[in-house]
Design a protein with these regions (language model features):
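Active-site-proximal alpha-helix that buttresses catalytic centers in soluble enzyme cores
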Residues: 2-6, 10-85, 92
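Active-site-adjacent alpha-helix immediately C-terminal to a catalytic or transition-state-stabilizing loop
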Residues: 91-124
Length: 124
């Protein structure tokens, strides 16, 4: 199995413009444009993605949608990629998708960086 870890694109800062919760913050115009380019570039890298798992927060979901669209896939939302979630929960969520060999995980910092550390430490 191959995991591709993606931190969401550039998001609107703070609570403004009618946004009342951090979970509602969308990507900025720059963030959307950047993620469109990233998704196109990923397609050129000979990645054979089977699955796109994403945090349910708006900015991560939007990022995942660009990637999924580029690969002709749907986005599966999982609370296991929400901020500050135990990585054991994420591993269980990934394991539920038995046939998937190449998976994009779209989440947040510092969680994605900590996940990389845990994967390296575990020798996965």
């Amino acid at each position: 199995m191959r995991l591709y870890l993606v931190r969401h694109g550039i998001a609107v800062e703070g609570l403004k413009g009618g946004i009342t919760r951090d979970s509602e913050r969308p990507l900025t115009d720059e963030g959307r444009e950047e993620m469109k380019l990233v998704a196109k570039a990923l397609c050129k890298m000979n990645i054979k993605a089977d699955l796109v798992l994403s945090s349910p927060l708006v900015r991560a979901r939007q990022t995942a949608e660009y990637i999924a669209e580029a690969f002709g896939l749907d986005v599966k939302l999982t609370d296991a990629l929400a901020p500050a979630v135990n990585h054991t929960q994420l591993f269980k969520s990934v394991a539920r998708h038995e046939g998937a060999k190449e998976i994009f995980l779209v989440g947040h910092e510092p969680d994605m960086g900590m996940l990389v550390g845990n994967l390296i430490y575990a020798g996965l």
